[in-house]
């Protein structure tokens, strides 16, 4: 299954959350798209709730179904911690997500583009794979020429706070994953237990 590339605002309104992280799409129209949008959000069945939560999390991080399920399976093999929390941690450790958390991009989609276009370095070496798994202690930065990108400057100017599991050096324009995130530092809108329930029925 390919990654969804349709209108992100419609997708956000359908799910009822801001997938971009900006909140603009929900602030403008806080109901699902379509002719019956304002009245279309009824009570979901248990199946519907699980599917809704799975799609919400998958689209939030911009993964296709195969990538998403692979990470979920990996998380289940980690002996310590809860399956759902470990899954969330693996999602957060993706390079595109860390770039977003550092404030080098305003959305995960923009962060993914920065990685794909070769602007991002890990420990000084260019890495253009958004799914690259960042380890604690690794330093994420920009290629020297990329430090002048206006979109990066705008993103950094818009930063008001960063999660405490990353640190950032404003002078060097680089940051570090200092530790793994705690559950309360990750997406609060997600109930990952519903995602676990969904896949437990399938796998």
Swiss-Prot record:
Q: Name one GO cellular component term.
A: small ribosomal subunit
Please name one Pfam family that this protein belongs to.
S4
Gene3D superfamilies of this UniProt entry? Ribosomal Protein S4 Delta 41, Chain A, domain 1, RNA-binding S4 domain
Segments forming a coiled coil: none
UniProt cross-references to SUPFAM superfamilies, sorted A to Z: Alpha-L RNA-binding motif
Which keywords accompany this UniProt record? Ribonucleoprotein, Ribosomal protein, RNA-binding, rRNA-binding
Start and end residues of each S4 RNA-binding domain: 93-153
What Gene Ontology terms for biological process does this UniProt record contain? ribosomal small subunit biogenesis; translation
CDD domains found in the cross-reference section:
S4
Superkingdom, taxonomy of origin: Bacteria
Q: Is NADP a UniProt keyword of this protein? A: no
**Keyword Ribosomal protein assigned:** yes
Q: Which GO terms describe its molecular function?
A: rRNA binding; structural constituent of ribosome
Function, in words: One of the primary rRNA binding proteins, it binds directly to 16S rRNA where it nucleates assembly of the body of the 30S subunit.
Q: Which family does it belong to?
A: Belongs to the universal ribosomal protein uS4 family.
State the NCBIfam families in the record: PRK05327.1, rpsD_bact
Please give the subunit comment from the record.
Part of the 30S ribosomal subunit. Contacts protein S5. The interaction surface between S4 and S5 is involved in control of translational fidelity.
Indicate what this protein is called per its UniProt record.
Small ribosomal subunit protein uS4
**Organism this protein belongs to:** Lactobacillus helveticus (strain DPC 4571)
- Organism placement in taxonomy: Bacteria, Bacillati, Bacillota, Bacilli, Lactobacillales
């Amino acid at each position: 299954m390919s990654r969804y590339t349709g209108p992100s605002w419609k997708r956000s309104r359908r799910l009822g959350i801001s997938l971009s992280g900006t909140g603009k799409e929900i602030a403008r129209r806080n109901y699902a798209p379509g002719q019956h949008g304002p009245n279309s959000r009824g009570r979901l069945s248990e199946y519907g709730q699980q599917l809704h939560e799975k799609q919400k999390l998958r689209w939030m991080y911009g993964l296709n179904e195969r990538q998403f399920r692979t990470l979920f399976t990996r998380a289940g093999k980690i002996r310590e911690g809860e399956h759902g929390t470990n899954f969330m941690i693996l999602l957060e450790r993706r390079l595109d997500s860390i770039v977003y958390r550092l404030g080098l991009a305003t959305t995960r989609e923009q962060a993914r583009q920065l990685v794909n276009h070769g602007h991002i370095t890990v420990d000084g070496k260019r890495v253009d794979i958004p799914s690259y798994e960042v380890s604690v202690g690794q330093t994420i930065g920009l290629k020297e020429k990329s430090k002048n990108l206006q979109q990066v400057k705008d993103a950094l100017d818009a930063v008001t706070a960063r999660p405490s599991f990353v640190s950032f050096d404003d002078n060097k324009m680089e940051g570090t994953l200092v530790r793994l995130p705690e559950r309360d530092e990750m997406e609060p809108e997600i109930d990952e237990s519903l995602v676990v329930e969904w896949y437990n029925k399938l796998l």
